[in-house]
Amino acid sequence: MSRATKLKVEDAPAEDTAWAGIPSLSLQQLWFSIQRREWSSLVAVPADRDMPVMDFVKPLYDVGRLAMGDNLRLVDAREVKLTRTAPLIVEMTGAVRGPGSKGGERVLVVIDSVLSHPSGVPVALAADAALLCVEMGKTSLTAARETLQIVGAQRFLGCITLPRP
């Protein structure tokens, strides 16, 4: 018989119970589900203008850091100017790896809405994959569809939603 520790379902923290330092079960599931796909750069794309995209990305990044440690970086590309997109793309895709850079590193990139900041389009297109960020009850279906069309629906691994405030 195995000596492995057994965990009963009732011993696990509930989804809505605050368990200090541990992200929600749904975020953990999202993180591990996107790990099944191959990517080294993943961009979070707000589906509409003026969205608090960091409210979506920071908790997901926290889960990723717990799982991957220093092998995950967060790149804040909000308000990036078109003249700065090329160096940013080089940084996020790892085209220029300096001495001491690690293999297996992944980058989570945050951009502003491509509807209000077109300079985010080349960044989104350069990433291996994307996640669509949607605020429930606030994001318009038209804006979400337009965002999918601009970036390319096939690039998206899924969608992160925030409930109504």
Listing of model-derived features with the role each one plays in the protein:
Residues 1-165:
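P-loop NTP-binding module
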